[in-house]
Every structure is written in structure tokens, then in C-alpha cells.
């Protein structure tokens, strides 16, 4: 979760510690009166559609140094979808396509800032005789976040999407959610966001990811996932006043921390429905307030789940935004 956005003041998306379109959806509270409360940390491994260009490189050839991708106008953050009509999802796909491609330029279909584009690249051979484009790609993203709730067989997390280099919602092909152990944190300070640090428990997959949208990252829980240790809770509407967040800053077990909801807006905002302020002395002394990795942490008021944390204010880590649970409930 590395993106910053402007909304009167600077805020930071809290999603994966490492990581616009508009959906016209409003959930009906009657569709699920009780769900299972999250608050526990999770490790995310998300696979993207296409190969994400993580870097550009020079290629040393017999004729000197060349930069085919850069010369063709490819940028870091672009997502390559096709080479000469062949679908690309990872570095191996690129390698195989280049091996079978005829001499000359190849056609590249890629996405930048949500728009599909086309260009031509002339591959070059390195000193080993291997065709290169001069790019580094990755096909997955991973990091730490927080589970908001489980509704039937569906798991809801983060409360915001995983974004690409240009702020667009990343298209995904799937992924895994694992249990996670929080091993430490970096305290947030004015002007600098803090973060949770943790490890994936790789042998403990809890869900398969199938959706990355405006309202968060969603999937289906594993068949062997035990919900008996979780707390059932009703969903409700928030109002200005005292509330709590249920989050984990050490180990695997979440705890309640005091906050105040200081502003609500569920009519005109899809995701920034609440402004919250941390008042819990213990949380302020440890993390400094809201930090990256808390994204998805449940907001509870009057014994009901009303939303999840999504952003921290860069200039004030005690404050942040939250999303209404009703925007997440049926995803």
C-alpha cells in the first residue's frame, strides 16, 4: 500500500504493506443481518492480469548497449497483455513468445492508466544470444493487511482496491490470503506513515482471492477454515460519536482500541464514508495511531460493525478515513 491521494489533505491508502472507476452499488442491510467479525491480520499474494513492468533495463549486445522497451515508449507501471497476439501473464510467457517470434519488430498490447495501448518493439539479442526486451516484470504483489469480515463463504478485506502505478484498479487473475503474524511496527509520525510488519504463515491459506474492486479485496474462504473462533456481529450505520477499531498490532489476535467517528458521508462518497480519530492512549503510544497494514480493520459502534479503516492522514496519523460496511457486504 504505497499510493497517496489528495482529498483536501494528503491521505495514504493503508492496504498491503510492502502495495477510479465508480461502482453504483449500495448494499441492502437486510441481505445479511449477522456476519463474522475479522480484525485479524492476513498475508496477501495477488496475481495480476498481464505482466507488470517493474523496471526497464539496458541490454548489452554485440553492437553495444540498447534499450528496446524504453525506445518503444514502454514505462514502468505499464501492464503488458499481449506480444504478437499471445497472452502474457509473467516473465516465462514473454520468454517463450520471444523464442518463437520471427525476426523483426513485435506488437505489444499494454495498459497504462487504465487505457489499452499498442506499440512495436524490436527485440535484441544479448551476448548469450537470448532475445531481450529490456524490461523487468512481475506477475504478483504481496503484503500485509486486515480482514474486515466473513459473510457466509465470502471474505472481505482492506476496504479499498490494490492500485497500479497510475492509480488504476489492478486487474487480477486470482490470489491467496494467508494467516499472518504481526512481528513489529514502525510508528507513524506527522508527514510519515507508519506500518505493521509481519510474516505470512504460508501453510495456513484461509481464502482464494477472486475480486479486487473499489470496495476492497474479496474471495472465498477455504473449506477447512474454522469460523467457530470468530464472533458473530450485526451490521449497522455509523453516527458521530465514540466507537472502536478491532485490529492487530502484535501477534495474531486482534484487540479493541478507542476511536471517535467525527464525520460521516454515506450518500456522496463510495469509499471515504467516515473520518475517524484515534483516542486510545495505548495505540497512540505504540503505533502513533493508524498505520499501513491496518487497512480493513473493523470499525465497531454500539456493538455493530459499521465499517473499516482505509486511509491515514499523512499530516496526522491519529486521523483517517473509513468505508461503510454496507458498501462491502455483497461483493
Residue ranges and their predicted role:
Residues 82-113, 316-318, 323-327:
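PDZ domains, with a preference for the canonical peptide-binding region formed by the helix
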Residues 69-91, 299-302, 306-310:
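Conserved PDZ fold ligand-binding element
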Residues 40-75:
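PDZ/PDZ-like groove recognition
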Residues 124-288, 292, 301-302, 310, ...:
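Serine endopeptidase catalytic core focused on the charge-relay Asp
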Residues 28-32, 40-42, 75, 95-135:
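PDZ-domain C-terminal substructure recognizer with occasional recognition of PDZ-binding tails
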Residues 49, 76-77, 239, 295, ...:
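Short, flexible surface segments
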Residues 67, 291-294:
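Short, small/polar residue-rich loop motifs at catalytic or cofactor-binding pockets
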Residues 2-26:
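Sec-dependent N-terminal signal peptides of Gram-positive bacterial secreted proteins and lipoproteins
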